[in-house]
Amino acid sequence: MKLSLIRSMTRSAVFELENGLCYRPAHPFTVQLNGETVYTACETNVFSLFSLLPGTPYTVAVQAEGETLTLDFTTEAETFFVDASRYGLVADGTTDNTGKLQAALSTCPKGGTVYVPAGRYRTSSLFMKSCTTLYLEKGAVLLGDNDRTHYPILPGVIPSENEVDEYYLTGWEGNPLDSFAGLLNITQVHDVVVTGEGTLDCDAQNGDWWINQKVKRIAWRPRAVAAVDSENVCLHGITVQNSYSWTIHPIFVKHLDLLSFNINNPYNAPNTDGIDPESCEYIRIIGANIHVGDDCIAMKASKVFLGMKLKKSCAHTVIRNCLLDKGHGGIVIGSEMSGGVKDMVVTQCLMDHTDRGLRVKTRRGRGNTAVIDGLVFRNVEMRGVKAPFVINMFYFCDPDGHSPYVQCRDAMPVDEYTPKLGSLTMEDIVATDAQFAGCYFDGLPEQPIERVSMKNVTITFDPNAEAGQAAMADNRPNVKKLAIYAENVKEIDLHNVKITGYEGERLRFANVGHFEED
């Protein structure tokens, strides 16, 4: 067992107890800072310290499982401390504070921190600037405006003078379409930190954001946090809730840290995914606690227009020690992934009653740049996940999702619009109380899934399981207690894969190439 520092900021820091367990330790542990007890019973492997002083050395000590682990660290330096209350904030939850909060953010000197004290501050869109920190104190709530006309509209595409180049400022479900600016926007900046124990509350349930959500009204819905074309961005500690649509949506961001924070959206709030990195690189999602009504974490890379034009994949991602609760999918790839998704490692995550666990969704039309490869899922626990492992290359999304082109089960020509799935590795995973299917792998006949490798995987079905759709595709029957279904897969390797409580044949294969099991 080891204690490690994930990241230190000016007034906060986040740590990880390296115990090999999924999200939670075997027993609660105590945390001390410079000899003073901070937590008497910490129940997560990742924990944070707040209200620290900048440029100050500290010693943190953890007492866990009979061991005492200590670690010295120093907070980052800070140039200036900007108390946003001095800008005339009114913390009554009603008064519009947008201009005052933006003034504090815009005038903060380089290397400074904007501090928002406890209180409820109604606001619309805010924009961060480079080399600054936003610190939300415990009890501070930035409360989203309920009137959509108060939000700026961001153009999806900005043309250049040469009428050839284009700049993509925002997007909606993988296309560069005009959208409202988010509650918090991190656009064309670098070295930005948002931290603290406060809350971004979009308050979408009290507006019209979730009504007729598929209809564009003025512009497409905003995100809670929208980051575009930025570098070295960190979100830490805060709670983000009641989002208008996707909660945290970074596009073209390099070096992104999402650490030890909470996302809470109602189970029936439409399209309120937790985290949707789109064509981002070098991502760390560690210690997230996500409760949503759609996908918890969905890795994306645009639809075919941007994907094939820019060829920007979502790559080099680490997801660790996260709780993924009640969503449609725990860890999801796609379906907007025309730029490709590569080199992702998921470890020590706990999925609790999501519809699907590890889920890949794509379809014809995403393009030959839509390559998914190098995905590793290791040391993951699933509880009550209806379909733990799903790969679906017939996903029925978009207006043409039910068309013969997308749903035809016969082989079609491999062309520039055919996606590809490479290697997926799943190891040391326990799934209990599954319902629909343990493994459901459905590749394209003309472009089969390259390789699926499973090692030390245990799946147990709920005795009272109900039938349902393992994958969202046409002409697929509802299934119940289906062990392993695979169609159009070049290679499947199963090593110490144990499935109990299933019905019918254990293996239901069609057009599977090399198969190995021990």
Regions found by a protein language model. Name each.
Residues 1-518:
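Extracellular/periplasmic carbohydrate-active domains that bind, remodel
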